[in-house]
A protein has these predicted regions:
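A short pre-motif secondary-structure segment
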Residues: 16-20
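DNA-recognition helix of helix-turn-helix
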Residues: 33-57
């Protein structure tokens, strides 16, 4: 079920969630990959988590 929900997520939410959860990258590393800040990565990850929770309910 989680894979279907992840597949539906738009970028960059999908990629950020994937990198953080499965790639075990820090928010600083994720931000650097996207040429963004650590805060951007953190906010994007938490928004993705909210979207996933809503889809799973």
């Amino acid at each position: 079920a989680i894979h279907k929900v992840l597949h539906k997520l738009n970028e960059p939410y999908k990629e950020v969630f994937w990198l953080r959860t499965f790639g075990e990258l820090s928010f600083a590393q994720i931000g650097a990959l996207f040429s963004k800040t650590e805060s951007w990565a953190r906010v994007t990850y938490y928004r993705a988590k909210i979207m996933i929770k809503e889809e799973l309910q």
